[in-house]
């Protein structure tokens, strides 16, 4: 096992992993899972042209609370391409249950782009494991959250970098929430000590950062906490 070099020097004997951290409920749970599995976690977040900074503030809170080797925030403006209500303020965020097929909150190729940054960070950090909070249960219908997509991405990743083609090891893309409902995810996170009051899930928060309570993400979150039988500490 190779030690992981930390952000401020020194070494960490744990194996390194990259965790994509949006600041939402799912990615916070995944960071807790990776920690529990014994990884030294490099959290990776993105300022990608989204409407608000509140999710990045949440990501910073979660990274600090759960403990990471370092937290990298990458600036990349996906809004220049348009095509999503999350990056284009002229496109309204639909209320839960009103979207047909793939909703306008889908950001074109977002997970492919984010995972590719994660792949680059993994190579430089000496990590062979990348974690993402994708789920095919209780989700908004995005094509890049499906298990077949992530399997294909992992296969590509192992053909794509100096580290993987050297034959020393293979890289694994982990989606530990893939087959969990939102309620099951919350139960798991609570058992691992996740403070969901630090997280943010809303697609269309108000100027003060408060969740809208009407978008698909708010609806899924509310239903999850209701099924678990505990109040949402974030008030969403």
Swiss-Prot record:
User: Which cofactor does the UniProt annotation name?
Assistant: Zn(2+)
Name the residues that bind Zn(2+). 202, 212, 215, 218
- UniProt keyword Iron-sulfur present: no
Q: What family does this chain come from, according to its entry?
A: Belongs to the QueC family.
Could you give a single Gene Ontology term from the biological process aspect? queuosine biosynthetic process
- Origin organism is Frankia casuarinae (strain DSM 45818 / CECT 9043 / HFP020203 / CcI3)
Pfam families on file: QueC (PF06508)
| Protein name as catalogued | 7-cyano-7-deazaguanine synthase
Residues annotated as binding ATP are 21-31
Cited NCBIfam families: 7-cyano-7-deazaguanine synthase QueC (TIGR00364)
Q: What does this protein do?
A: Catalyzes the ATP-dependent conversion of 7-carboxy-7-deazaguanine (CDG) to 7-cyano-7-deazaguanine (preQ(0)).
User: Pathway listed for it?
Assistant: Purine metabolism; 7-cyano-7-deazaguanine biosynthesis
Q: Which domain of life is it from?
A: Bacteria
